[in-house]
Amino acid sequence: MRILGIDPGSRKCGYAIISHASNKLSLITAGFINITTTRLQEQILDLIEALDCLLDRYEVNEVAIEDIFFGYNPKSVIKLAQFRGALSLKILERIGNFSEYTPLQVKKALTGNGKAAKEQVAFMVKRLLNITSEIKPLDISDAIAVAITHAQRLKPR
């Protein structure tokens, strides 16, 4: 089974695809979608096109998205909600459903502490998947963590 984990962001959208087979996890690919255009409509289209490419190329079975973190800037939260809505619609069209996890759930699943720092989550991602190189930016390790969290909640196959 292939799981796509997504960490939506207003400038970078982290993604990771992991394989979950026989209770073993392995990383297939991970990266981020850089949102560089200035017009919101173009940003949404770029994001959706990139998601389409990932779904086509890697034959994803399940998708997990991290819930929006409510920061102090309402404008950023609204923009992020628009991105997340567009992602959700595309995933529903292509896959049929998706799962959502709060940052607290993801941190707790990987570190045992719902208030863990992003660096602690990145450390556990590397440890669980036997990754020796640095994972930068942290949007990528967050996306991997979302995928791992989802894999942990699935029934063994």
Curated annotation (Swiss-Prot):
Binding-site positions, Mg(2+) 1: 7, 139
PROSITE patterns xref list: RUVC
Active site: 7, 66, 139
Cofactor binding note of this UniProt entry: Binds 2 Mg(2+) ion per subunit.
Superkingdom per UniProt: Bacteria
Pfam families named among the record's database cross-references: RuvC (PF02075)
Cofactor(s) demanded: Mg(2+)
Keywords assigned by UniProt, alphabetized: Cytoplasm, DNA damage, DNA recombination, DNA repair, DNA-binding, Endonuclease, Hydrolase, Magnesium, Metal-binding, Nuclease
EC number(s) reported in the record: 3.1.21.10
Binding site for Mg(2+) 2: 66
UniProt GO MF annotations: crossover junction DNA endonuclease activity; DNA binding; magnesium ion binding
Localization per Swiss-Prot or TrEMBL: Cytoplasm
Reaction catalysis annotation: Endonucleolytic cleavage at a junction such as a reciprocal single-stranded crossover between two homologous DNA duplexes (Holliday junction)
Function as written in the Swiss-Prot or TrEMBL entry: The RuvA-RuvB-RuvC complex processes Holliday junction (HJ) DNA during genetic recombination and DNA repair. Endonuclease that resolves HJ intermediates. Cleaves cruciform DNA by making single-stranded nicks across the HJ at symmetrical positions within the homologous arms, yielding a 5'-phosphate and a 3'-hydroxyl group; requires a central core of homology in the junction. The consensus cleavage sequence is 5'-(A/T)TT(C/G)-3'. Cleavage occurs on the 3'-side of the TT dinucleotide at the point of strand exchange.
Subunit text: Homodimer which binds Holliday junction (HJ) DNA. The HJ becomes 2-fold symmetrical on binding to RuvC with unstacked arms; it has a different conformation from HJ DNA in complex with RuvA. In the full resolvosome a probable DNA-RuvA(4)-RuvB(12)-RuvC(2) complex forms which resolves the HJ.
Protein name (record): Crossover junction endodeoxyribonuclease RuvC
